[in-house]
Amino acid sequence: GAASLVVITGGLPEGETDLFAVRERALEGFHRLIEPARASGVRLAFEPLHPMVCGGRSVISRVADALDFLDALNTDDVFGLAVDSYAVWWDLDLAASLRRAGPRLLHFHVSDWLRDTEDVRFDRGMPGDGVIDNRRLREWMEDAGFRGPVEVEIFSEKNWWRRDPDDVVRTILDRRAEFL
């Protein structure tokens, strides 16, 4: 089975505007997952998402806020962190937050933010197509102690999803040395 599973908080419910209250409810919900997760032996890797999707998908956007959330749960044997370059590349405090995360780093997802993206969910670029310095982010992850796999996560409805899968894999392999 899986060693860990990526989880998100979810966004604000319809009609809700109190971000702080929703974060507190999310924290309460994750507290209820501690014992079932511990019993299963599967760690939960909490993933902050880009602030552009905060309303509907996640009420936590910065790695520092995710770490505060994990600190409040106080169960590093159960919870860790998933870092998605697409979601956190813009955070000027990211390097310090990754150092703070240290052994709680469980997953690392990479893609690229296109300069003129048309859809924040389904218009991701392949590493090297946009503005994210994935190589630097990987170095920060490794400096913080991360030794896991780098997962290329391309949600690209109008581009990469329409290509031959073998070509997509070849592109990833061709670009890994330069951009990852």
What residue ranges belong to the model's regions?
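Active-site acidic/histidine proton-transfer and metal-coordination neighborhood
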Residues: 1-80, 90-92
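Histidine-acidic metal/acid-base catalytic patches
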Residues: 2-3, 60-83, 87-180
